[in-house]
Regions:
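P-loop NTPase catalytic core
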Residues: 1-158, 166-169, 174-177
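C-terminal accessory/interaction regions of large nucleic acid-associated machines
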Residues: 172, 176-188
């Protein structure tokens, strides 16, 4: 641990933990979502503002996604140690749901006119879409099916990120995503 960073974290109300590993993997912005934090989210004034301007459930949803990212990181470490066959298929589903959160919500293309600036309405729509997927139970026989399926899903969602909000193209990708979810959803 680096002393300047550790001492800064003690006094800072908001901290972006830049991570070389994320930069090396081209996961931009290269900010570690687990080590980064904002104390402002705990302030009652901020909570009131969010409830009044966005949604009563926004902070809870953000905290849920952070928890899912943490769980995904823990499972990734287990997979690295035990191998893909060494963990249950359900662990792969949890891991890939965390990857979905990372690729679709946290990563951003600063060179894309649409993805570079995301209005709050669009953020809320995408956040709800991803949370719904995270709450969906899927059926897979092996880890390869999980990986292939979620890579397709991530690709469709990324295309939505590059499409103008509520445009025909955006709606088309949304329809494609719903069909993809229905393919493996236990409840469909």
């Amino acid at each position: 641990k680096e002393p300047v960073t550790e001492n800064t974290k003690k006094v800072a109300r908001c901290f972006y933990a830049l991570e070389q590993d994320r930069a090396d993997k081209k996961r931009y912005p290269a900010v570690n979502p687990i080590d980064s934090y904002s104390k402002y989210i705990e302030y009652p004034e901020f909570e009131e503002y969010i409830k009044g301007h966005i949604n009563d459930e926004w902070i809870g949803k953000v905290n849920e996604l952070k928890t899912r990212l943490q769980r995904g990181k823990e499972i990734a470490e287990q997979i690295n140690i035990l191998g893909d066959d060494g963990v249950p298929v359900e662990y792969h589903v949890i891991f890939w749901k965390s990857e979905l959160i990372d690729f679709v919500i946290l990563q951003q293309d600063a060179f894309d006119e649409i993805d570079a600036v995301t209005p709050m309405e669009r953020q809320e729509d995408i956040l709800n879409m991803i949370i719904d997927i995270c709450h969906t139970e899927f059926d897979f026989d092996n880890f390869n099916e999980v990986m292939d399926y979620f890579k397709k899903m991530i690709n469709v969602c990324k295309q939505m990120n590059y499409s103008k909000f509520k445009s025909e193209q955006y709606e088309g990708f949304q329809k494609q995503l719903k069909e993809l979810i229905a393919e493996r959803s236990v409840n469909s």
